[in-house]
Amino acid sequence: MPIKVKIKNDGEFISEKPVQIREIIRSDEVIAAVFNGKLIDLRSTIDSDGEVEFVDLFHELAPEVYRHTMSHILAQAVMNVYGKKNVRLGIGPAIENGFYYDFEILNGKITEEDLSRIEEEMKKIIEQNIPVERIEMSKDDAISFMTEKDQPYKVELLKEIQDNKVTLFKQGDFVDLCRGPHMPSTGMVKHFKLLSVSGAYWKGDEKNPMLQRVYGTAFLRQEELKNYLDLLEEARKRDHRKLGPALDIFFIDFDVAAGMPVFTPNGTVILKELMEFSRQLHIEYGYEEVMTPLVMSEKLWRMSGHWEHYKENMYFTTKEEQQFAIKPMNCPGHILVYKNKPVSYRDLPVRFFEFGKVHRYERSGVLHGLFRVRSFTQDDAHIFCRIDQVENEIAGVINLVHRIYSQFGFDYSAELSTMPEDHMGDEATWEKATEALRKAMESVGLQYVVKEKEGAFYGPKIDFHVRDSIGRTWQCATIQLDFLMPQRFGLVYTSMDGKYQQPVMIHRAIYGSLERFLGILIEHYAGAFPTWLAPVQVIIIPIADRHFEYAEKVKSEFVKNGVRVKIDARRETVGYKIRDAQSMKIPYMLVVGDREADSEAVSVRTRGSDFGSKPVKLVLEKITEEIATRSLKNLMEE
């Protein structure tokens, strides 16, 4: 039977025998192909009917191929630098904006200082323009080959492969186990930079050997690489793991409570402001605040399914021969509140929200400042409603998301994830629920991308991604429909005809984790919070000791009006105090001396401007208005 291959936007190819992709390409610029939805190498063989799309350097998948090849060049360079017999290879995939490779260096290690030497070796490999070859062989032969090369990690990977045929890629004397695809030659990749080296357990398991992971970035054009490196430098300056402790917002004591941040008075002020802002809006939108236990019995977690599916991420304690778990999620607690009294169709929708502290075990190797922790607070809410109410409820949540994100100056985007292959519930209910999500987003004019078959097994969902001030995106809010929990817990409401019906449950969080959201805000604002969020909103700087009394008088007026204010009474120069206040990102610095005391005024400075002498009354009015309206702008500049 002839093989028929439809070429996207370019007719059809018919062959009487299996054919390699490179035999049917019609341009020298093609680097890979997509066959029946799968990214493949040009040297791959087609032996069945299907549709092929060619990937050139302008295709959206080109960076993945480019970066994957760069990871092999990195591995080859490391073997050249440290000696082939001293290097054991782990894995080396392409990742977003870059690539990495894991190594075990026998009798040595890779240091940050070594990266420049490795880069130079990579450039030599690129200059040689070595052809990249694809090799097919049996799994047994590949195991023998890698055993002979003393590559135990590759042997382990090979033994896990189900197919009897595997692929390897060769460039010069370097050979690696890999599915591909790769660029046709090493000379086709040029613009790269090695970024860092860190530890990484083999397969991410702490029981396995610790390898060394070298990270790099690569782009098709030099300008893109430069822009990305500039972004990384700006992100480094904004890193919340440095700014947070420097601004006395939080710290983490890894000897006492790894992954569990400790918030100072400054950090606590910010978190309380975030919660109060959210609380006010939730009440406005018809939510009722609840508080549920931190520790609940094994029985509850078995019923919810967490015991079966989430046990490895939970913390436990046993008392009086009964096992308890510290809650990793708030939903079972909210279900208890719902079940506490009978619910009629007239009562629906019911909306509960809670600033619930949860604990989830994370491996120490993945902990990352406030972004990946073991203890955090969720702005968690659950809505119980009828299926015909879903659209309106989702629209209400989207509006609430908009109100909250706009307050911080965030743009955002949305994704709709639909029914996966493995799902519970009938398809008709899924379709109705998914359509309700679509209509809700469209009714409020929210643009979205559809992620086919990426919903949870218990319901479709909407994810929101915020974009920060330097263009990075962060997944924060989630709206999740759930058909499973109401069924597991036997949730019901009395319908109009007096019969019991099962409600739909909507899980949603907007900040997501308050701690993570705070980390995002620190980096978004580079620590310079808008006045309403700033831990210290005003600092008063007396020029000399004789001005302390007037400084206290000014402070008293601000405190009475709800402003967070301090006096810098240190025996330092005014210039030093101003520089220190600016380094601590305090929004307003009010300098007071003889002239100000005589005229009931203050000399006003902000983080970037000097407004000179202004009446205390005017300054107080501007600052209190700025705080009350939660303005992102400095109102003194208006």
From Swiss-Prot:
This is Threonine--tRNA ligase. Its EC number is 6.1.1.3. Binds 1 zinc ion per subunit. One of its GO terms (biological process) is threonyl-tRNA aminoacylation. It is an enzyme of class 6 (ligase). Zn(2+) binds at C331, H382, H507. Residues 239-530 are annotated as: Catalytic. Keywords: Aminoacyl-tRNA synthetase, ATP-binding, Cytoplasm, Ligase, Metal-binding, Nucleotide-binding, Protein biosynthesis, RNA-binding, tRNA-binding, Zinc. Its cofactor is Zn(2+). HAMAP family: Thr_tRNA_synth (MF_00184). Residues 1-56 form the TGS domain. Homodimer. GO terms for molecular function: ATP binding; metal ion binding; threonine-tRNA ligase activity; tRNA binding. The keyword Cytoplasm applies. It comes from Pseudothermotoga lettingae (strain ATCC BAA-301 / DSM 14385 / NBRC 107922 / TMO) (Thermotoga lettingae). Belongs to the class-II aminoacyl-tRNA synthetase family. The gene is thrS. Its main location: cytoplasm. GO terms for cellular component: cytoplasm. It is found in: Cytoplasm. SMART domains: tRNA_SAD. Catalyzes the attachment of threonine to tRNA(Thr) in a two-step reaction: L-threonine is first activated by ATP to form Thr-AMP and then transferred to the acceptor end of tRNA(Thr). Also edits incorrectly charged L-seryl-tRNA(Thr). It catalyses: tRNA(Thr) + L-threonine + ATP = L-threonyl-tRNA(Thr) + AMP + diphosphate + H(+).
